[in-house]
Amino acid sequence: MLTDMDISRRAPLKDIAVLGAEFGLLPDEMQLFGKTKAKVDLRVQQRLAEQQQGKLIIVTAVTPTPHGEGKTVTTIGLTQSLKALGNKVCACIRQPSMGPVFGVKGGAAGGGYAQVVPMQELNLHLTGDIHAVSNAHNLGAAAIASRLYHETRLGKAEFELQSGQNYLDIAPNGIRWHRVVDHNDRCLREIEVGLGENNGPAYTSGFDITAASELMAILALSRNLADMRARIGKLVLAVNRQGAAISAEDLGVAGAMTAIMADAVKPTLMQTLNGAPCLIHAGPFANIAHGNSSVIADDIALKLADFVVTEGGFGSDMGFEKFCNIKARQSGLTPSAAVLVTTLKALKANSGLTSDADINAPDQARLEAGFANLNWHINNVARYGIPVVVAINRFATDTDAELNWLIEAVAGTAAFGCELSEAFSQGEAGALALAQTVMRACEQPSEFTLLYPDDMALEAKLSTLAEVGYGAAGVSLSEAAKLQLQELSALGYADLPVCMAKTPLSISHDPQLKGVPQGFIVPVRELVLNAGAGFITALVGNVMTMPGLGLVPGYLKIDIGADGEITGLG
């Protein structure tokens, strides 16, 4: 079989202006970037404000493993198959961060014959949205550091006299706003800034990956440009000596930060291998942020398509949970059905049983033990009140006997249906049965339900997420988290939803606990207010907001020839 890159290169692409017109966009609603991609102007939201919405489908997965479950492959494959069945359909996915592209995970365009193309353009830069987020974020960091410098240098009276601005009285070590970069770079996790003569005062800070920036979450959750501007104004950059928050609005930098992101607020239109439209927008990670593409992209797609297929990062305890309790809660755009992706390899890897056998080899004992993980995720999705269809992403090494056993086992669960998907090897033809079952699921009566109400106490939300969302015995808060809990409640932020930042490699907080862990306590070490994004992040265990590169990073495979052709992506 051809490589992903070769398939992408050989694909007969439709001119993006033609594809956009067929999708329902007007010429002045598209800002073209060559013939392969276009920004979608938000004026289309106003034109289609009264348009009836299509059906929203959210794709999620079992607990991820190093073998790859094929969630994006299934998302794109399902989109292609829905189109092949005569439906007007659109996929909405996140823009890949270059950190994972050059790290371990690789690209995020799908794979095989279920891809967004050209895949090299999607995986590297695209239309520059992530760079805009990085620059806007770092402007905020430079602005608050500069303000601290000038206030310290001049004192209150002289500062106000010379600058004409209010003295913010920034506390020593009161700056909360890190800098960001779109790479995995562990040595930047903790740094000292302001060292040297006339550069200070010095304080401890650090870098996060851009996907972890609150600005990225704001981009993904904003309804329009005005909403994004208002949210950016609420960003908490520092605290003063009295402990009160200093916002981007207080600093006077919110307008400039928003201006940098003026084009980033527009989704990017691309296409799948069979010419289905795909809107790419925003890229928050699901382990350290809320892990879903933008509300704006969903809103536009739902007004133009019969079916919209989107995905949440990692397993259903991560991106799907945050899709429901953060994204859908804020946007009001709720799903009609969910697709839960699994593989034989994933279930064996999640079995908790050790084996020297090849993961591709038949192993009924491991498969049966790992089925508990799939059943947990089925029940987890079903508790939100929507029908769930299990998609078994078939690999060439899978045996019919094990596949048939799994299909029969799923029939005894809460799943609406179960279908094999061979979209990777067969493209649109490989997921037709899945598409038909998903269409039937979308017609079922459903009542979307949140895990907790807005007015639940903040500590109770944490407990509910841990106990109901993960099956934990409870939560434990560090002393710092206990103080932060009191502060956030006193300041009136207890009505915000919670975004758990934890490992994706287990339903629990511990990546070593496989299958369906029980009796564990979720350790919350820190609570972080994201006033602009509208949620509170609970940092759990040892999760990092700046990843590091592995021993054998992905960039080792990537090169470019004299003809300009990039190799090694995928």
From Swiss-Prot:
It is an enzyme of class 6 (ligase). One of its GO terms (molecular function) is formate-tetrahydrofolate ligase activity. InterPro entries: Formate_THF_ligase, Formate_THF_ligase_CS, P-loop_NTPase. Gene3D superfamilies: Domain 2, N(10)-formyltetrahydrofolate synthetase, Formyltetrahydrofolate synthetase, domain 3, P-loop containing nucleotide triphosphate hydrolases. It holds the Pfam family FTHFS. It catalyses: (6S)-5,6,7,8-tetrahydrofolate + formate + ATP = (6R)-10-formyltetrahydrofolate + ADP + phosphate. CDD domains: FTHFS (cd00477). ATP binds at T65, P66, H67, G68, E69, G70, K71, T72. It comes from the Bacteria. Keywords: ATP-binding, Ligase, Nucleotide-binding, One-carbon metabolism. Belongs to the formate--tetrahydrofolate ligase family. This is Formate--tetrahydrofolate ligase. It comes from Shewanella sp. (strain MR-4).
